[in-house]
Design a protein with these regions (language model features):
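Short beta-strand segments
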Residues: 14-16, 40-42, 232-234, 256-261
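A short, compositionally biased micro-patch
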Residues: 10, 136, 229, 239-241
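Basic/aromatic-rich interaction segments and small domains that mediate binding to polyanionic partners
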Residues: 240-260
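A generic structural signal for residues embedded in beta-strands
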Residues: 33, 227-229
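Intrinsically disordered, low-complexity linker and terminal regions at domain boundaries
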Residues: 258-301
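Conserved glycine-centered short motifs in functionally critical loops
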Residues: 157, 161-227, 234-237
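Short, basic/aromatic beta-hairpin or loop at an interaction surface
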Residues: 1-15, 194-207, 253-254
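Acidic-enriched and Gly/Ser
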Residues: 1-191
């Protein structure tokens, strides 16, 4: 086991581990640390704790110091400079006629580098733009092309549920989502209905996946034959996954009757689950395209 603290450098960004070097650092404090990008000002989201060695990427870098009021002031000034940098970079993009959309600007704490994040449909030759920006800011310039998921994470928005987007509110990292999750939850497989603001499969499909997998594993399939505790045998006509109720079609004399049972009142042989949805080729291709476009955040490189 090794003692670490967890630090973020962006809101809802990835959490990185650092060595507290014996300091009693608490959640909510700010620290100065050295990263691959240089000296950075970070927000402590996980106080001192022990984690397993295999959870830590070695060598574990130490905390340089707990942030001072002067450090806080420098960070606040950097935030102001980032707004001005965005405006200047947008002007330069227009000047060079580049087909790219600027999303965010970021100063490193030591002011040795300015990073600009942008989206574009293809590759962009921005070499002349970098030279132009370097002559203005007199520091190292880095332009980084990001995807639509990163763009949405930065800008935020409201989902179809009426709540702030998960990626902008609390998700530290993008989680893999798949068509299978939508099927498991009995959702419409219309790409429009299960896509987020970014145009990719909604992150929230992952939230209830395990619950639905467990609940579905306890139920028979529609069309299966089951035995009931009251001595009847019938065909499953429908299931209610969340309430764990099953409607069974039972023959009573010359008539057929639909009765509802709790899943615990039925006996059946579990078998490999079948695909429960019929999707046309066009919709399936669209869904598979969305699934292929899932990727890791470019902010974490």
């Amino acid at each position: 086991m090794i003692k670490v603290i967890g630090v973020r450098f962006r809101k809802t960004g990835k959490i990185y581990y650092f060595d507290p070097v014996g300091n009693d650092i608490e959640t909510g404090q700010h620290v100065i640390v050295e990263t691959a990008r240089g000296v950075e000002y970070g927000h402590v989201v996980l106080g001192v704790r022990e984690v397993e060695d295999d959870k830590v990427i070695q060598p574990l870098k130490p905390v340089i110091r707990v942030a001072t009021p002067e450090d806080d002031q420098i960070d606040a000034e950097n935030r102001d400079k980032e707004k001005k940098a965005l405006a200047i970079c947008n002007e330069k993009i227009k000047k060079h006629g580049l087909d790219m959309k600027l999303i965010d600007a970021e100063y490193t704490f030591d002011n040795n580098k300015v990073l600009f994040y942008f989206t574009a449909d293809g590759r962009i030759d921005f070499r002349e733009l970098v030279k132009d920006l370097a002559s203005v800011f007199k520091v190292r310039i880095e332009l980084r092309q990001i995807g639509v998921r990163d763009e949405t994470k930065v800008l935020g928005g409201i989902g179809i549920c009426g709540r702030p987007l998960c990626c902008h509110s609390y998700l530290s990292e993008f989680i893999p989502v798949s068509i299978k999750m939508a099927k498991e939850q009995n959702l419409s497989l219309n790409p429009v209905k299960i896509s987020g603001v970014c145009g990719r499969l909604m992150c929230c499909l992952k939230n209830e996946e395990e619950t639905y997998e467990y609940l579905n594993s306890r139920l028979p399939e529609v069309g299966d034959f089951v035995n009931t505790t009251d001595g009847c045998r019938g065909e499953v006509s429908s299931v209610n996954v969340l309430r764990q109720l099953v409607k069974v079609k039972i023959e009573v004399g010359d008539e057929k009757e639909i009765r509802e049972y709790k899943v615990d009142e039925l006996k059946f042989k579990p078998k490999r689950r079948r695909e429960r949805f019929n999707v046309n080729d066009e919709e399936l291709k669209a869904l598979e395209a969305l699934e292929r476009q899932e990727g890791k955040s470019k902010f974490d490189d």
